[in-house]
UniProtKB/Swiss-Prot annotation:
Pfam family, one: Cyclin_C
GO cellular component, one term: synapse
InterPro entries per the UniProt record, alphabetical: Cyclin (IPR039361), Cyclin-like_dom (IPR013763), Cyclin-like_sf (IPR036915), Cyclin_C-dom (IPR004367), Cyclin_N (IPR006671), Cyclins_cyclin-box (IPR048258)
Modification comment: Ubiquitinated. Ubiquitination state is negatively regulated by a deubiquitinase complex made up of bam and otu.
A GO term, aspect molecular function: cyclin-dependent protein serine/threonine kinase regulator activity
Gene3D superfamilies per UniProt: Cyclin-like (1.10.472.10)
CDD domains recorded: CYCLIN_CCNA_rpt1
Family the UniProt entry places it in: Belongs to the cyclin family. Cyclin AB subfamily.
Region (Disordered) location: 1-21
Name of the protein this chain belongs to: G2/mitotic-specific cyclin-A
Organism per entry: Drosophila melanogaster (Fruit fly)
The keyword Lipid biosynthesis appears for this protein: no
Length: 491
């Protein structure tokens, strides 16, 4: 083992006042003792730092000269001069008190020149306008950093809800219509962070346009199952039904389920899989989607447990690497769920209509070969149209046509397919989706009866919708002309 030695001062140049006893070799040289005699024992203890009095703030008695304290007098209290000023000593209890946050009030606020304090904006209630006998929302400030996609509040989201300041009398009036007693439509805050993000008005159409461009990339092949030798559509349906149960067991977001199916189809479009490894591929796909979409995704051990230990952690992690390599790490894509959420926000969609739309859209995940040829935007638009028709509403509106960029005639083929899928859902062996949407959370939309629709029925609906649109177009110019003339003469 290598060793080193400190240079020895053999000539005693550093400390000439200290003598080294005769016969003592390799003795370490101590530091010079300040304030001692000329000769001291070489083995005497080194001086402590108390002899170096560098504190210039110590109160000194008047008329005396402060000198260095003798090292030998070790019983002298260094803080003896502070005894007269006990009022400056902070009590022990005060040291552990928490600090307080400065808050503006009328005593500390400074009003700008020409303005009174009463005209300043209240920082706590800047979005509430108090009137005589009423409280209504004004200019709700939207959160610009959405972090969650579910109704559970995100750890980084700020709760700015002001529903608590609304009087119960205001809520009871116009509950369904959202109209205040004064006749003004209330601007209720969004329900979660995703919808709060989409409420940014100036970006709404740009976001939709970006979704439409992104959905065309990284599409799975519609007929990939024909090249699979060991698996079939029935096996795929059973796997997706199991993924629905897993997502409900761990309360994963619906977007996680859509992404899992999307990754599965893209992987199977390029790789041939044996039936014994199909569940492993689905498990790894959901594991990737959960890590991509969820805030707190389940651990890999949870997925291994759900497979009844059919696979090991190493196998799941290895399959995760294979899937990511085959997909080239291109994981971001808009699904039908994203479009449905966007339409729900822009059109102020009722909850029952939204859940019915989601139920119809999720049923389409079970049939890969039928619906993989359609874009998610088209699938979501057709699901909205069929859900409105089932609930007895008008199938299509000008607002939906403007947002989705699809006319009612463009949805004919997909709507007819979805109508057949919704009708035969009760006869399927895979019932996880029906059990999911039979709950009170989803308004039990799966219990509603399906409707019969043929091509002729759909053509009649399209004709009626187009006739109504023409009538509205004939009436609209007269109203606009009258309004423009009035505005022109006012100026």
């Amino acid at each position: 083992m290598a060793s080193f030695q400190i240079h020895q001062d053999m000539s005693n140049k550093e400390n000439p006042g200290i003598k080294i006893p005769a016969g003592v070799k390799n003795t370490k040289q101590p530091l010079a003792v300040i304030g001692g005699k000329a000769e001291k024992n070489a083995l005497a203890p080194r001086a402590n730092f108390a002899v170096l009095n560098g504190n210039n703030n110590v109160p000194r008695p008047a008329g005396k000269v402060q000198v260095f304290r003798d090292v030998r007098n070790l019983n002298v209290d260094e803080n003896v001069e502070y005894g007269a000023k006990k009022s400056n000593v902070v009590p022990v209890v005060e040291q552990f008190k928490t600090f307080s946050v400065y808050e503006d009030n009328n005593d500390t606020q400074v009003a700008p020149s020409g303005k009174s304090l009463a005209s300043l904006v209240d920082k706590e209630n800047h979005d509430v306008k108090f009137g005589a006998g009423q409280k209504e929302l004004v200019d709700y400030d939207l959160d610009s950093t959405p972090m969650s996609v579910t109704d559970v509040q995100s750890p980084m989201s700020v709760d700015r809800s002001i529903l608590g300041v609304i009087q119960s009398s205001d809520i009871s009036v116009g509950t369904e219509t959202g109209v205040s007693p004064t006749g003004r439509v209330k601007e209720l805050p969004p329900r979660n962070d995703r919808q709060r993000f989409l409420e940014v008005v100036q970006y709404q159409m740009d976001i939709l346009e970006y979704f439409r461009e992104s959905e065309k990339k990284h599409r799975p092949k519609p007929l990939y199952m024909r090249r699979q030798k060991d698996i079939s559509h029935n096996m795929r349906s059973i796997l997706i039904d199991w993924l629905v149960e897993v997502s409900e067991e761990y309360k994963l977001d619906t977007e996680t389920l859509y992404l899992s199916v999307f990754y599965l189809d893209r992987f199977l479009s390029q790789m041939a899989v044996v039936r014994s490894k199909l569940q492993l591929v689905g498990t790894a796909a959901m594991y990737i989607a959960a890590k991509y979409e969820e805030i707190y995704p389940p651990e890999v051990g949870e997925f291994v447990f759900l497979t009844d230990d059919s696979y090991t952690k190493a196998q799941v992690l290895r399959m995760e690497q294979v899937i990511l390599k085959i997909l080239s790490f291109d994981l971001c894509t808009p699904t039908a769920y994203v479009f449905i959420n966007t339409y729900a926000v822009l059109c102020d969609m009722p909850e029952k209509l939204k859940y019915m739309t989601l139920y119809i859209s999720e049923l389409s995940l079970m049939e890969g070969e039928t619906y993989l040829q359609y874009l998610p935007s088209l699938m979501s638009s057709a699901s909205v149209a069929l859900a409105r028709h089932i609930l007895g509403m008008e199938m299509w509106t000008p607002r939906l046509e403007e947002i989705t960029t699809y006319k009612l005639e463009d949805l004919k083929t997909v709507v007819l397919h979805l109508c057949h899928t919704h009708k035969t859902a009760k006869e399927l062996n895979t019932q996880a989706m029906r059990e999911k949407y039979n709950r009170d959370t989803y308004k039990k939309v799966a219990m509603m009866e399906s409707v019969e629709m043929s091509k002729d029925d759909f053509d009649q609906l399209c004709e009626a919708y187009n006739c109504k649109q023409k009538e509205d177009e004939h009436q609209q110019p007269d109203i606009n002309t009258k309004s423009n003339v009035n505005l022109f003469y006012k100026f």
